[in-house]
């Protein structure tokens, strides 16, 4: 497991880095006192979870030895790594001007320029010990997150999870849906007394729907649409894509179509989850 310490000058992108690490599965803590690092690591060791902790000028120990002592007392299962983010002086000034936030050292009656320079001196002990230094001067938020994934995971793209969920329109449209597809126009197994008690997960219902060309056409065209735009969605710095399929009651058609789409993208090596809202309510 890894204990990633994220530091750097204010405005260099520490919050962005912490969010990116959280998306990679790290347990993230913002501005934890250095002295508590061993305690956090011992707690997480039982969960087999890597952690990321941000340290800035506000919680920097007075002596570098305090950090070294904390590192020495980490559980053996953790490997410490220090990530330091930086940006040139003019970029930091511009970012503060854009956000209109106060610099952490501004309370010392320093000008923004002097606060940035003093912070640089205070953080030098951390910078000199960094395993990885990233200059974010020319980076966007998305580019920084992408670089971290490339450096730490060895790949550029985020593992986007596709969620296919069925629902019934009479129960309302899911508020978490990125895309909503209406399949109420497809042939309805509900009108067959033998199929009515079943769901789209049952083979007789699947066989009924599989006999209809319009069902095949809809599934094919929907998956083609998603495949066309999936690369752009994956590059949009997101973790989930939720596709909601709705029929009247959320029991037959939407369940079948959602499962068909989930199986298709799963067979293409994508991270896929499926859920069925109406069926979950019946349990």
UniProtKB/Swiss-Prot annotation:
Provide the species name: Edwardsiella ictaluri (strain 93-146)
Quaternary state and interactors:
Homotrimer.
A Pfam family name for this chain? PapZ_C
For ATP, which residues are the binding ones? 8-15
Q: InterPro entries, from UniProt?
A: P-loop_NTPase, RapZ-like, RapZ-like_N, RapZ_C
**Entry keyword set:** ATP-binding, GTP-binding, Nucleotide-binding, RNA-binding
- Family label: Belongs to the RapZ-like family. RapZ subfamily.
Task: Enumerate the residue ranges of region (RNA-binding).
Answer: 266-283
Record function comment: Modulates the synthesis of GlmS, by affecting the processing and stability of the regulatory small RNA GlmZ. When glucosamine-6-phosphate (GlcN6P) concentrations are high in the cell, RapZ binds GlmZ and targets it to cleavage by RNase E. Consequently, GlmZ is inactivated and unable to activate GlmS synthesis. Under low GlcN6P concentrations, RapZ is sequestered and inactivated by an other regulatory small RNA, GlmY, preventing GlmZ degradation and leading to synthesis of GlmS.
Query: Under what name is this protein listed?
Result: RNase adapter protein RapZ
- Write out the residues that bind GTP: 56-59
Q: Does the keyword Chloroplast apply?
A: no
A GO molecular-function descriptor: GTP binding
What the entry lists under HAMAP family is as follows:
RapZ_like
Highest taxon in the source lineage: Bacteria
From the record, give the cysteines joined by S-S bonds.
none
